[in-house]
Structures are given as structure tokens and as C-alpha cells.
Amino acid sequence: MPFFVRKINIPTIFGIYFGMKTDKKTDKKNLNVHFIGVGGVSMSSLARYLLSVGFNVSGSEIAPGENLEKLAEEGVTIYIGQSAENVEGKDVVVYSDAIKEENPELKRAVENKSYVLKRAELLKIVSENFSKKI
């Protein structure tokens, strides 16, 4: 696990949101989740899922694409280009193995003490909320 990833206790994604001690934990609409590199199949699916259950979702990608247009139409805030400003005010930042440590969004999320999760960690959390797993 990279040095910059905060290890947190997460019983469920919907019970105590990401283990956060905040007044936001009772209202998903006030919890801001950002995906660095949201254009891929897995990251966009996780973004759609969190949006569908009521979270505030945003994501960034280095270049525009059809999948990003669809995400935007569904209600995900999309940023083209990856900039530190994109993660300001975000409570949780999700990234995949394709994202390098020097990524400006990832670096700022760590500086801001946002909860930083790998895509695989979020996928595990989400899957724990279903009785049948594939």
C-alpha cells in the first residue's frame, strides 16, 4: 500500500460513511466523492452506483469522451484535465492503479486529508453491501 493512502475502518459504505467522523455521515447528498480517471469502465460504474444511491459524485479525466458525456447527463460533475482544484471540498477521493503518485489531484487530496481509496478498496466496500457476490 502506498505511503499516502490512509487506512480507515469501513464497516459499510452506507452505515458509517467511510468511517468519517463528521456531521455529513447522516446525509449522503452532503458527502462528496471524486474519482480520478473516471472515464474507464470500472471507475465510471462505481461513480454511477454511488450517484444512484444518493452520493454527490464528481470525476476527472485527461481527455473528453462519450462515456464522460453520459456520466455528465446522469448527474456526475465532470472535469476535463486533472488539476488540484478539482478535489477541493471533496470528502473521499478514489483512484486506480493507473494514477501515479505525482498526480496533482491525488497529491492535493492527501494534503487536504481527504479519505483516499483505491478503486479496488471501494469495490470491496460496495460488494459487501450485497448478499450475492460474483
Description of each model-found segment:
Residues 1-3, 17:
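N-terminal, intrinsically disordered, basic low-complexity segments enriched in Arg/Pro/Ser/Thr
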Residues 3-8, 25:
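Polybasic, lysine-rich low-complexity intrinsically disordered segments
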Residues 14-122:
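N-terminal leader/targeting and accessory segments in enzymes
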Residues 35, 124-134:
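Walker A (P-loop) phosphate-binding motif
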